[in-house]
Amino acid sequence: MPDMKLVVIYPRPKDVDAFEKVYQDEHVPLAVAKLGGKTKMVATKILGSPQGTAPFYRIAEVYFPSIHALEACAASEGGKEALAHAVKISAGGAPIFLVAEEETFTFTKTVNA
């Protein structure tokens, strides 16, 4: 069964340093403590875009073993608290929340003949 994940996409904040402080010091520990049923969390910082400055700054992916586990987490008091905090700290506008099913494609290294 593929992994299910909650994806949170944060717009570029007006003050990157202030956002990073609250994200690292408050939000990540809160998410780790309150999001029940998760199996891992991947946090990505967006460095740029081929078109110039990227409109988004961070992507958080929280993995769950099933859609039922993700839904139970989102409906829980801890899940609601963590999601509300994500909205509160998003200093560049409202974050985007997505539910996704992951597919993985693995490539092997080939040698040109």
PLM feature spans:
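Macromolecular interaction modules
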Residues: 1-113
